[in-house]
């Protein structure tokens, strides 16, 4: 799935409603070097686990460095964006409450 407002970012649903998941959905993001996700907000929280690469989590709370093994919590209604600042793809897992449109 590609996302409006993103550059070099791809999202793939790993576990969703189609798998019978009623409470949470698990998504995988890959952001190319120099790429970013949309700068956006939504009414639900989500949790991030960084798998590979390096980047910056841009948010109202201030910019945070992202590296493999880091975890990040994004509060509901918080403006946020993930930027790849490294030389290899930035990959992370994102958990969101279900049901939600996978592009949100």
Predicted regions: what is each one?
Residues 19-22, 32-35, 54, 98-101:
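Short, charged/polar surface micro-motifs in flexible loops or helix N-caps
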Residues 28-32, 41-59, 95:
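Short, conserved beta-strand element in jelly-roll/cupin
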Residues 35, 43-44, 62, 78-79, ...:
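A generic "binding-loop/recognition-motif" signal
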Residues 11-12, 27-42, 76:
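Conserved short histidine dyad/triad with adjacent acidic residue
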Residues 61-76:
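Short acidic-glycine-tyrosine-enriched beta hairpin
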Residues 28, 47, 73, 87-103:
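A short hydrophobic beta-strand segment most commonly corresponding to one strand
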Residues 38-39, 57-58, 74, 80-87:
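Short beta-strand His + acidic residue motifs that chelate non-heme Fe in jelly-roll/DSBH
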